[in-house]
Amino acid sequence: MRKLFKKLTLSLMLCFLSTTLYPQELVVEMLSGNLDDAEKLAKAYLEPFGKSFGTSLNNGWYTTAKPHKLFGFDFTIMAAMAVPPSGDKTFDVSKLNLSYWELQDPANKLTPSVTGDKKDGVVLTDKEYNTATLTLPQGENLDFIPAPIIQLGFGLPLHTEVVGRFFPKIDIEDLGDFSLWGIGIKNEFKEFIPGFK
């Protein structure tokens, strides 16, 4: 079951994110020059994906507000999705306070993030000699960010339910391992409020 889910998850991620693989290689190019600048550029470019992916993982914890009865349970396999905010489709390079790189054209300072439009990023040049240039990667026009998830809910005493969420460990070549889990609790506390039914 774990192998099947691993393959299914990898397949879903590759289907939805296959278009983002090539531009991510360009993030490595940002490492040429100054490491601090590379960190700022990579963070600004990739952060909208991380925020949206995190939001999609935070969705769908329940399908009903009523907790399970004692020892009742449900098992769910789902794909949560989040829509990246339009304000995260670009970022302003001039606000990053880069120390090695500067904008080749100061009037053109907005560049796409990974979730932005598929157009070339701005061109940077080294501040000291103006000989090296770096073209920032284009966006991937991601309208939504998916997250496949396994979830189990289990009923406890006192109208309480514990919910566990799991994304199995996946080894992504050259990037490392990725996994996550989370726990949530639901309680029907209205029984503790006098006169409330």
Spell out what each predicted region is.
Residues 1-27:
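Bacterial Sec-dependent N-terminal signal peptides
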Residues 62-64, 137-141, 171-174:
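Outer-membrane beta-barrel domain signature
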Residues 69-71, 143-148, 176-183:
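Residues that define the transmembrane beta-barrel architecture of outer-membrane proteins
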Residues 71-77, 160-164, 183, 197:
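Transmembrane beta-strands of outer-membrane beta-barrel proteins
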Residues 64-66, 75-77, 150-156, 183-189:
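Residues on the lipid-exposed face of transmembrane beta-strands in outer-membrane beta-barrel proteins
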Residues 79-83, 166-170, 189:
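Transmembrane beta-strands of outer-membrane beta-barrel pores
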Residues 23-120:
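Outer-membrane beta-barrel biogenesis signature
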Residues 63-71, 86, 159, 174, ...:
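Short loop/turn motifs that connect adjacent beta-strands in outer-membrane beta-barrel proteins
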